[in-house]
Amino acid sequence: KNRLLFPIIFAFIFSACSDFSGNEDEVEASLKPVAKQKKKVEEEATRTYYDLNGITFGNNTFVAVGEKGTVRTSSDNGATWDNGTRGTTSELNEIAYGDSTFVAVGERGTHLYSRDDGTTWDNGTWSDDDHVTGVAFGSNSFIGVSSTYLTKSTDNGSNWVRGCSGVRVYDMAFGNNKFVGSGAEGAIQISDNGSGCSTPSGSGSRTTEETLYGITFGNNRFLTVGSDGWLSITGDNGNNFTALTIPTGANHLYSTAYGNNIFVAVGSKSVVVSDNDFSEDPILKANSYTFNDVTFGNGVFVAVGNDEIIYTSTDGDDWTKVHGK
């Protein structure tokens, strides 16, 4: 009897061990996603997130710029983001696209340009070290803005010259063959090409003493946004502005963009949406987000903020976080 039992017991043990050995790979494989996710969480918890100040769209690519020369790019409508090579360690304030070129401007007179969709950057030739806060493209020229003068490049960012002086604008937009800038104490500047500037001549040219941080062009109108939720529009290329009703609860607005037949303005815990003809008062859609800049492309609004936060929306109402802390 014992001789018969031994082979049976041995066969049972061998079979059990074989089953366990065969499952080792399966067990290890099942643990890998958990370990991978844990590693990703740990990396995200310890990595440094930089503030993003500006964003634009061109050549089916979103490019965002910010603190310490940070560059982030997306070619899938904002779903995923890659790191561009930093062309500087200076703060980058704003970015624009035109003629197959991205141009970013910032502190200490920084003027950078990229011709490969934000992957690599070169320094434009510029001698001054004033802070440049905005940039726009139009009439085959890039125009940068500072608190005292404009800068201008006609060779896609390679070389820059000083434009008109005495301006006090923070941002600029191009439309109807005009550059219109907005800035301190309701200041508005109009220029054909950045070399010469004029102040609006209309009786409604200066409607506020509020600081106008952002401006955009859409549906044949310029829209400015600023401190304390200020919004104003012009349909005559900047000569006369009309103040809009400030939405209840709106705070400082820093940027605005046009797309999908609406204007979207973003700022300090404020997202404001207006229809394209301003037949109704602007509406505060969200008061939990703080964004520094917003742009539109491929049917999507993309907004950026501190700690590298990036959100997307199609209507300015519902926002999805796609990147950041």
Which residues fall in each region the model found?
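Flanking scaffold residues of small Cys/His-coordinated metal-binding clusters
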Residues: 9
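C-terminal motif of bacterial Sec signal peptides marking the signal peptidase cleavage site
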Residues: 15-16
